[in-house]
């Protein structure tokens, strides 16, 4: 579960290393984001010469959460860290590579480009 002020690792090659969630999109009272949800975040740490720099406000989709999530078949999915992939305004990923596994929920939420770039879908 991601909420305001949560820090997430960036799982793509845009140059950002860490982001801080400033808003969960999807309704005025929405408090938490899970796998496949879009957030607004600010870049807290970035590598020099990357596509984004520290202080940039970006949209991102959550691809891994440390809090377990129950799936419709009764199984649970949990990761070691919270991670996100930065998005362009049209919903496509900004980077050309995705690092680490991503949740199957991204396929249900129509993030097919991220699913195809990911090395593993769990």
From Swiss-Prot:
InterPro entries: Ribosomal_uL14, Ribosomal_uL14_bac-type, Ribosomal_uL14_CS, Ribosomal_uL14_sf. Gene3D superfamilies: Ribosomal protein L14. GO terms for cellular component: cytosolic large ribosomal subunit. The keyword Endoplasmic reticulum does not apply. Transmembrane segments: none annotated. Belongs to the universal ribosomal protein uL14 family. Binds to 23S rRNA. Forms part of two intersubunit bridges in the 70S ribosome. This is Large ribosomal subunit protein uL14. The lineage of its organism: Bacteria, Bacillati, Actinomycetota, Actinomycetes, Micrococcales.
């Amino acid at each position: 579960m991601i909420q305001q002020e949560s820090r997430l690792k960036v799982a793509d090659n845009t140059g950002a290393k860490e982001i801080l969630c400033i808003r969960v999109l999807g309704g005025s009272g929405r408090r938490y984001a899970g796998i496949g949800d879009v957030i607004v975040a600010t870049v807290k740490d970035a590598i020099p010469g990357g596509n984004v720099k520290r202080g940039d406000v970006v949209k991102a989709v959550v691809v891994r959460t440390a809090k377990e999530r129950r799936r419709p078949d009764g199984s649970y999915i949990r990761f070691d860290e919270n991670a996100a992939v930065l998005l362009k305004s049209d919903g496509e990923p900004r980077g050309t590579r995705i690092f680490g596994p991503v949740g199957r929920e991204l396929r249900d939420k129509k993030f097919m480009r991220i699913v195809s770039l990911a090395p593993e879908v769990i």
